[in-house]
Amino acid sequence: NNCPLDWLPMNGLCYKIFNQLKTWEDAEMFCRKYKPGCHLASFHRYGESLEIAEYISDYHKGQENVWIGLRDKKKDFSWEWTDRSCTDYLTWDKNQPDHYQNKEFCVELVSLTGYRLWNDQVCESKDAFLCQCKF
């Protein structure tokens, strides 16, 4: 575990919640600039979702939803992670994703679900965000 103090170590990667509010694009750029190889976080198992949810509940200062690295670039419900990892696990909130008004193409953790479930959201909305890095 080479993660800095306030980062969550999990499966060889480190995760950190940032409380400043950014658009999805700005959040991804922030993670990338933080350290080469960093991205908005990706998830691949239920256990990871739970651990992250617990971590965010402990460290997130606001009530806002939290951006993760999933988006629908082609706008056709083909979801992709920014770290190019396999989209093998999805845990949507009820009746999501819905591309509401054909405007929602970025994915956030929903605070009302304890950060366990996902919603597609307008990418220009401002949320807190979760970076994932290797140290």
Swiss-Prot record:
Tissue: Expressed by the venom gland.
GO CC list: extracellular region
Cited Gene3D superfamilies: Mannose-Binding Protein A, subunit A
InterPro entries in the record: C-type_lectin-like, C-type_lectin-like/link_sf, C-type_lectin/snaclec_domain, C-type_lectin_CS, CTDL_fold
Motif (Galactose-binding): 96-98
Gene Ontology molecular function: carbohydrate binding; metal ion binding
Residues in C-type lectin domain copies: 10-132
Protein localization: Secreted
Entry keywords, A to Z: Calcium, Disulfide bond, Hemagglutinin, Lectin, Metal-binding, Secreted
Keyword presence, Metal-binding: yes
Binding site for Ca(2+): Q96, D98, E104, N119, D120
Annotated disulfide bonds: C3-C14, C31-C131, C38-C133, C106-C123
Pfam families given in the database record: Lectin_C
Family to which this protein belongs: Belongs to the true venom lectin family.
Function: Galactose-binding protein which recognizes specific carbohydrate structures and agglutinates a variety of animal cells by binding to cell-surface glycoproteins and glycolipids. Calcium-dependent lectin. Shows high hemagglutinating activity (MHC=10 ng/ml).
Assembly and binders: Homodecamer of disulfide-linked dimers arranged in two pseudo-5-fold symmetric pentamers.
PANTHER family the UniProt entry points to: MANNOSE, PHOSPHOLIPASE, LECTIN RECEPTOR RELATED (PTHR22803)
Name recorded for this polypeptide: C-type lectin Cal
Organism, scientific name: Crotalus atrox (Western diamondback rattlesnake)
